[in-house]
Curated annotation (Swiss-Prot):
Domain of life of the native organism: Eukaryota
Location of the region described as Disordered in the Swiss-Prot/TrEMBL record: 1-22
Coiled-coil spans in chain: 22-65
Keywords: Coiled coil
Compositional bias annotation for Polar residues: 7-17
This protein's name: Putative uncharacterized protein DDB_G0286635
Amino acid sequence: MEKETPQQETKQSTNKESGFFDEIIKRTNQLLEKEKELHEKYNKEITSQQDQIDQLKKKINQLKY
């Protein structure tokens, strides 16, 4: 087996680090996408609930008069 030169060791180390950071970037992007999906979902729910509240307020006002 050949002994690796310092240059080869550095290259392998750099490749490992690059792969590590690529994985971090990939996972970060997945989390950001999931966060975006959750925001959209909850914004829809909030809007729906606000619409229901508005309808109930109208009914209450109609009953008052």
